[in-house]
């Protein structure tokens, strides 16, 4: 399906690789002008240069560290002054380190809440005034299926993702009267560097082969495979489009049917 995003400006977190990069590419292909955020300058520059420009868009990037949320806020605010109001915000941040809850330090929880919840909040505060001026606003949070059902071995991630889910639902309710939508896309196991790290970590912890772990994980998915990042991006782009104007406050699992609940 084609979605007309001509004239729309979109901010994409974690846009230099994985799901974030796929989302940035998909938005750009539909005509949006994209600002991607991540830490690595070289990877950002390469990713931005590779984004589609069917309408001659001029894409941008900012090297930022989510852990430094004050600096991130200042950098994005300055960019918006030069660029103009953003119409679309895609909150997307790599997940916390895997492991059981009782092995997680307080610092791990604080870092995860800063990187996900606090950064989402600061970015929303920056972009919503412009969305109101523009008469168009879409906030899409790329979270995890653990919003619906906790995942084994991802204690910190399960905890912070649930917080983001409730933050998103609350914000959706607050912004619904002004027509700004807020939704969550919940990726299942997706072929990214993070998934490879999880597989390798489980293999090392259980002294089994990475292939055995991978096969076991795929067997838990009714469709029998991992998602491609572009499949996650397709759901995000739809929620960011004009066609999704009456959809807000929902969670969309993109997981091949793995999530056990409705």
Regions picked out by a protein language model, each given a short descriptive name:
Residues 1, 149, 236-237, 248-262:
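Short C-terminal tail/terminal secondary-structure segment
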Residues 176, 181, 247-249:
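Short, small/polar-rich loop/turn modules that mediate ligand/substrate recognition or access, typified
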Residues 30-47:
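Conserved glycine-rich Rossmann-like NAD(P)H-binding loop of the short-chain dehydrogenase/reductase
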Residues 129, 173-174, 245:
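Alpha-helical segment proximal to the catalytic Tyr-Lys
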Residues 9, 16-17:
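Conserved glycine-rich cofactor-binding loop
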Residues 140-164, 168-177, 189-190:
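Catalytic loop of short-chain dehydrogenase/reductase
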Residues 100-102, 108-113, 139, 217:
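Substrate-binding pocket helix/loop in short-chain dehydrogenase/reductase
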């Amino acid at each position: 399906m084609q979605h007309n995003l001509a004239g729309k400006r979109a901010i994409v977190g974690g846009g230099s690789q994985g799901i974030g990069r796929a989302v940035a590419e998909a938005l750009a292909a539909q005509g949006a002008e994209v600002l991607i955020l991540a830490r690595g300058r070289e990877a950002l520059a390469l990713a931005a240069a590779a984004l589609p420009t069917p309408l001659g868009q001029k894409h941008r990037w900012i090297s930022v560290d989510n852990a430094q949320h004050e600096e991130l806020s200042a950098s994005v605010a300055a960019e918006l002054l030069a660029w103009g109001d953003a119409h679309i915000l895609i909150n997307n941040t790599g997940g916390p380190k895997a492991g059981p809850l009782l092995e997680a330090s307080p610092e791990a929880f604080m870092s995860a809440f800063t990187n996900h919840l606090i950064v989402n909040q600061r970015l929303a505060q920056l972009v919503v005034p412009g969305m109101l001026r523009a008469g168009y606003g879409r906030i899409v949070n790329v979270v995890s299926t653990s919003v619906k059902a906790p995942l084994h071995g991802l204690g910190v991630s399960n905890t912070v993702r649930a917080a983001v889910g409730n933050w998103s639902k609350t914000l959706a309710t607050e912004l619904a009267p002004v027509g700004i939508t807020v939704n969550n896309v919940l990726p299942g196991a997706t072929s990214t560097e993070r998934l490879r790290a999880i597989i390798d970590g489980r293999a090392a912890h259980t002294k089994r082969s990475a292939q055995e772990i991978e096969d076991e994980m795929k067997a838990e998915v009714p469709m029998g495979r991992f998602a491609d990042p572009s499949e996650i991006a397709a759901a995000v782009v739809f929620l960011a489009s004009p066609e999704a104007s009456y959809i807000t406050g929902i969670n969309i699992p993109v997981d091949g049917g793995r999530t056990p609940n409705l």
